[in-house]
Amino acid sequence: MNRFLFLMYFFCGAMIATEVTQYKAKYQFDSEEISISGIREFKKKNDGYELKFRASNIVASMFFISEFDIDEVGVRSNSYEIKIRPKFLKRDQLIEFDRQENIIKSSGRNTWKSSFISDEIAVDPLNAQIMIRKFIKENVNQFSLNLINMQEGGIETYNYSVSNNIKCDFNNEKYKCVVLDRTQPGSTRKTTYYLAEELDYMFLKIIDESEEWTNKLELKEILSFG
């Protein structure tokens, strides 16, 4: 999988139904190849929800947006779009969910079409973490999510497990953090999430590790909350 594809799994977050907290926050992303900060914003629209992230520096610009509905079961994805423009990579991709035909379609750099079960929750890299926060809020310590395969289409299952409860530092204050690990059968990649209880389980830090790299996303400033 392309290394920049991993960025899409970082820039996300929210709640569920009436517990959804709208917010705007600044995050810092660091890897061996790039360091960039940007604004992530979650808000309710007249016809659903929107979660987006926008960042830029002298070598790259990034834009991610997920549009979706939330019902009593969870997230219902509508569309997901990415635009990444480092000097050494141009990547545009649009994912559309057709729930009448039960088809997921991708256009842009990766073009494919996949079918899915009508009542199946298939999440994109952004709204996946809405489901994560839902489960953590409900004190579920182990669960799985079906994420779309951005390159080839279809659904991939990822497993999540709470591994610890610790104190985290943010803005000169201590927060109760749930430490959550994400793994996939047959892969050495591991993603660790640090979710702050006092901030409705907002993501304070995410560390993505494999044998080849370590990527890190960290909350720097909350611009608005609630």
What are the residue ranges of the model-derived segments?
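Compositionally biased, intrinsically disordered low-complexity regions
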Residues: 14-15, 40, 110
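Acidic, serine/threonine-rich low-complexity disordered tracts
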Residues: 18-99, 140-226
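Hydrophobic, well-structured mid-protein blocks that either form specific transmembrane helices
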Residues: 90-136
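Low-complexity, compositionally biased segments
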Residues: 5, 101, 127-130, 184, ...
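Sec-dependent N-terminal signal peptides
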Residues: 4-14
